[in-house]
């Protein structure tokens, strides 16, 4: 067993990288873990804590990938400094929002894994797609058009990073890479892009059918820049 898995509870409680768990978070998660074990939805306490620790590590790595997607042309998984030519001349991407979305989306995946229930998801911030794509590449949940191009290897992540906001066009005048600036048809799990901040999320109350579950990442985009006739407090 790897050293960081010798004591799953202590491993998770200690956090990882910039991720720190408050006493309140630890208390609530302990109660949740005990309830899930009692309900036989997760095998045992150690398994649950191992999943929690894994979520921290995926989140930390995905946030690094998101930052690289905005500023860099490639990633060095060994941690060596990048050269000046490895940085994009014109950085683009909604980095702040995407960094916030990473732990939210990983938390959604963690909830699915802990409970054995796959939920749908709606993200009000379609422009934060870097978070979704980074996490998907790391865990191997990419779309058919992305399979074989993006993965968690250094080469696969570097292709993801280099393709982001590349505006590459093929000979037919179509996008040459399966990656956009917003959630789109090539984003695994995405089925709709509202085209207006918060438009799709306004329907979240009515979206799931009876017996279905939905996780919604609400956006305050209306306060950010757009207040249209459909504006509503979130």
Give the label of every model feature segment.
Residues 1-107, 222-227:
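Conserved acidic/glycine
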Residues 58-81, 92, 97-234:
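Cofactor-binding active-site loop characterized by glycine-rich and histidine/acidic residues
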